[in-house]
């Protein structure tokens, strides 16, 4: 049976207040072969702290920081390191 890996890309800029809910929705999926790449697009809020909590809970969460470059730039940075056969964008 084919069980492809899904790469979920979550670009974040000043969305810390929504990040936990978005990442919890990923964790609650019934399909388990995924990685979730949280891309902090230079947020001055506490996005990094929240993301690091999730990374420490589950190795399928990956954190990436980059200088602010906008939504497309953040998505592309996540896609560049994605290992999945399919890409799923998810906005926090």
Placement of each model-derived feature along the sequence:
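Glycine-rich, basic loop-to-helix element that forms the pyrophosphate-binding segment
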Residues: 66-82
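N-proximal low-complexity "stem/linker" segments adjacent to membrane-targeting elements
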Residues: 1-27
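Short aromatic/hydrophobic "clamp" motif used to bind/position activated sugar donors
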Residues: 87
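Catalytic metal- and UDP-sugar-binding loop of GT-A-like glycosyltransferases, i.e.
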Residues: 67, 90-92
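Alpha/beta-hydrolase active-site loop signature
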Residues: 14, 43, 70
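Acidic donor-binding segment of Leloir-type glycosyltransferases
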Residues: 23-64
